[in-house]
Curated annotation (Swiss-Prot):
It is an enzyme of class 2 (transferase). The keyword Transferase applies. Its EC number is 2.4.2.1, 2.4.2.2. InterPro entries: Ppnp (IPR009664), RmlC-like_jellyroll (IPR014710), RmlC_Cupin_sf (IPR011051). One of its GO terms (cellular component) is cytosol. Disulfide bonds: none annotated. One of its GO terms (molecular function) is thymidine phosphorylase activity. PANTHER family: PYRIMIDINE/PURINE NUCLEOSIDE PHOSPHORYLASE, PYRIMIDINE_PURINE NUCLEOSIDE PHOSPHORYLASE. Gene3D superfamilies: Jelly Rolls. It comes from the Bacteria. This is Pyrimidine/purine nucleoside phosphorylase.
Amino acid sequence: MITEKIDNISVTTKANVYFDGKCVSHGITFTDGTKKSVGVILPATLTFNTGAPEIMECVAGACEYRLAGSDSWVKSAAGEKFSVPGNAKFDIRVAEGFEAYHYICHFG
């Protein structure tokens, strides 16, 4: 099931802009203190570093990702999630000519 709406949150109004604008996100905080980010990745191949473990939930579009130590790219489309360990790197790519990858990043 795709998350379409998130209620009862506080939103950081200034965007986090990475990789010359290829990735843009906003931080959100729930009333219980849980933090997530909601964002979009435009066509590109990018490498991210994690602090805490992350679950990337695709809400629209698609991407391919590759976890550190792997040679294989794995597709993730709307309604799918993938997990990334804490203190790790992962690559993500969105193909040119395709819809941007819209996501929710669940931390911890």
